[in-house]
């Protein structure tokens, strides 16, 4: 699910944080990709009649079709992908996962009913809601990646958090996922739509965390608190708190502790905090996720030549893919993985670390900006109060 409305909040308040461009702009870059999110997107790319792509034996092949051709598209454009798979979910996420499972069960029943009585749109809508990524899907995709010569690693828990670690360490240029919570895990750059099909003609969104924080006038802790208020995978949102309200609450109070205190003291009880709402635990999962250090041997990876005959055996003989297309794709992989070895010019220059004085100046400017925002809001509130207090002119 990610963070509800976060893209909208950043687009409206920190537009400089978002760049949209063509996939070829990322030539020569290494990118860590959230594998589970990608596989899910491949599985919901169903045909209009709501059916998954199937082999002759009735096995689902949508995930393999998507993984093979979308990865091929990236490599064709000079990108070197690394896939990161989810490990066990954090305990705090189990409640949300249970709710999702219940929703999928309801959707399955609704899907069956729609097939009998509903429209084509109903069938497709409920079909998408029944989709879930299984261990078998993951295992088959890992087998495919190995045969393609594309590296993958397993994260201890959340794949997005591990992608963020690799991006911060400079082992990859960016983390790629549709989940906006990748930014909460401190990924410096998030790429979205990278694994979308070419037919969708969606530009690649490149979101820079530092620019988002600057535009929002927040530090990382406040940004995480904002994301929890917006609604994340770990907690249900506070009813009636939408994106504008969430942003105002954090700007007015600074921390979730003070937001909660303000809500609980409000005599009007405009908002009601859910009975069990362990926001501090959710914050801790974003600040200190269970991840491997970027220098851990488990995080070593390299790109290798594809096993062409192995791909033919697996995709053509086992899964019923077209042999000419598979061989053609494997040949492109072999050729373009070598081309992707070429370095971008920016790779020759390492960013210079900021001095303590520069960091202090940035912090001072940030604090001044926050104070200025608070002062302006107080003045606006005072002006409104005075306007209300003025006697109305006689008609």
Swiss-Prot record:
GO terms assigned for molecular function: 5'-3' exonuclease activity; 5'-flap endonuclease activity; DNA binding; magnesium ion binding
GO biological process: one example: DNA replication, removal of RNA primer
Where does the chain bind Mg(2+) 2? 179, 181, 233
Q: Region Disordered: what ranges?
A: 96-122, 357-395
The protein's Enzyme Commission number: 3.1.-.-
Keywords in alphabetical order, please.
DNA damage, DNA repair, DNA replication, Endonuclease, Exonuclease, Hydrolase, Magnesium, Metal-binding, Mitochondrion, Nuclease, Nucleus, Phosphoprotein
Please list the cofactors this protein needs.
Mg(2+)
The UniProt entry, under CDD domains, shows:
H3TH_FEN1-Euk (cd09907), PIN_FEN1 (cd09867)
Where is the protein found, in the record's own terms? Nucleus, Nucleolus; Nucleus, Nucleoplasm; Mitochondrion
Q: Which Gene3D superfamilies match?
A: 5' to 3' exonuclease, C-terminal subdomain (1.10.150.20), 5'-nuclease (3.40.50.1010)
Which cysteine pairs are covalently linked by disulfides here? none
Q: What class of enzyme is it?
A: hydrolase
Q: Does the keyword Mitochondrion apply?
A: yes
PTM comment, free text = Phosphorylated. Phosphorylation upon DNA damage induces relocalization to the nuclear plasma.
- Cofactor detail note: Binds 2 magnesium ions per subunit. They probably participate in the reaction catalyzed by the enzyme. May bind an additional third magnesium ion after substrate binding.
Task: Report residue spans for region: I-domain.
Answer: 122-253
Q: Where is this region: Interaction with PCNA?
A: 341-349
> Where is there biased composition of kind Basic and acidic residues?
357-389
Q: What is its main location?
A: nucleus
Q: Subunit structure of this entry?
A: Interacts with PCNA. Three molecules of fen1 bind to one PCNA trimer with each molecule binding to one PCNA monomer. PCNA stimulates the nuclease activity without altering cleavage specificity.
Q: What does this protein do?
A: Structure-specific nuclease with 5'-flap endonuclease and 5'-3' exonuclease activities involved in DNA replication and repair. During DNA replication, cleaves the 5'-overhanging flap structure that is generated by displacement synthesis when DNA polymerase encounters the 5'-end of a downstream Okazaki fragment. It enters the flap from the 5'-end and then tracks to cleave the flap base, leaving a nick for ligation. Also involved in the long patch base excision repair (LP-BER) pathway, by cleaving within the apurinic/apyrimidinic (AP) site-terminated flap.
- Please give the family membership noted in the entry: Belongs to the XPG/RAD2 endonuclease family. FEN1 subfamily.
Q: What's the name of the protein?
A: Flap endonuclease 1
Species name: Emericella nidulans (strain FGSC A4 / ATCC 38163 / CBS 112.46 / NRRL 194 / M139)
Its gene is: fen1
